[in-house]
Regions:
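Short acidic-hydrophobic surface loop/beta-edge motif
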Residues: 52-56, 151-153
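Short glycine/proline-centered loop/turn elements that form peptide/ligand docking sites
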Residues: 30, 47-50
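Short N-terminal binding/cap micro-motifs at the start of the first secondary-structure element
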Residues: 24-29, 53
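Active-site-adjacent pocket-lining segments in enzyme domains
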Residues: 14-20, 24, 37-47, 64-180
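Hydrophobic residues within alpha-helices
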Residues: 31-32, 100
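Short, Lys/Arg-enriched N-terminal segments with co-localized hydrophobic residues
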Residues: 3-12
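A cross-family phosphate/adenosyl-ligand binding-site feature
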Residues: 55-57, 61-65
């Protein structure tokens, strides 16, 4: 019992932030939060607006843990970008989100449309292996990505996934990367 408790305590050092914008894909965000928290990781949802309540692409409203103005990303291991439309577009058009992603020295994970809509225009896929939701490959390629036809593409500091059906594997890849 004591060993398990210690293990969970140590895992909370793996700080992760999941951005939530109006129109986010609920499965991609909530599944990842659930998987990370079950693994003992410190996973926080961040609303990109001043309102903690964020409504997903399918009408599910979620109360985020904090807003962008309340978040301190300085010790983040992971920044996680769910997809969904118009969620991915809303993230891409938010200057604060783009700045945080570009300045982040840690790891980034993006799923569905977000590799193409959010990461590629920021230059974060340049020369990297990636996957995305079908139809967004050209955006990724424009950003310099080497496209892979796999559900989840995991490297040392970048994980991408192709959509809702890969959400569980996406979350597990983040956990495996952080905790082994």
């Amino acid at each position: 019992m004591g060993v398990r408790s210690q293990s969970i305590k140590e895992n909370t050092m793996c700080r992760s932030f999941i951005f939530l914008a109006e129109g986010f894909e609920e499965i991609e965000a909530i599944t990842v939060v659930d998987v990370l928290r079950r693994a003992g990781m410190d996973a926080k949802t961040v609303s990109i607006t001043s309102d903690l309540n964020v409504t997903g692409a399918h009408g599910v409203t979620v109360a985020a843990d904090m807003t962008m103005s309340e978040a301190d990303f300085s010790d983040a291991e992971w920044l996680i970008v769910p997809g969904g439309m118009p969620g991915a577009s809303n993230l891409a058009s938010d200057e604060a989100v783009c700045r945080v992603l570009k300045e982040h020295k840690g790891k980034i994970a993006a799923i569905c449309a977000s590799p193409g809509v959010v990461l590629a225009p920021l230059g974060l896929l340049e020369g990297r292996d990636a996957t995305c939701y079908p139809g967004f490959e050209e955006m990724c390629k424009k950003g310099g990505a080497q496209m892979r036809d796999v559900p989840v593409m995991a490297t040392r500091d970048l994980i991408t996934a192709n959509g809702p059906s890969a959400a569980m594997r996406f979350g597990l890849a983040i956990v495996a990367n952080s905790l082994g």
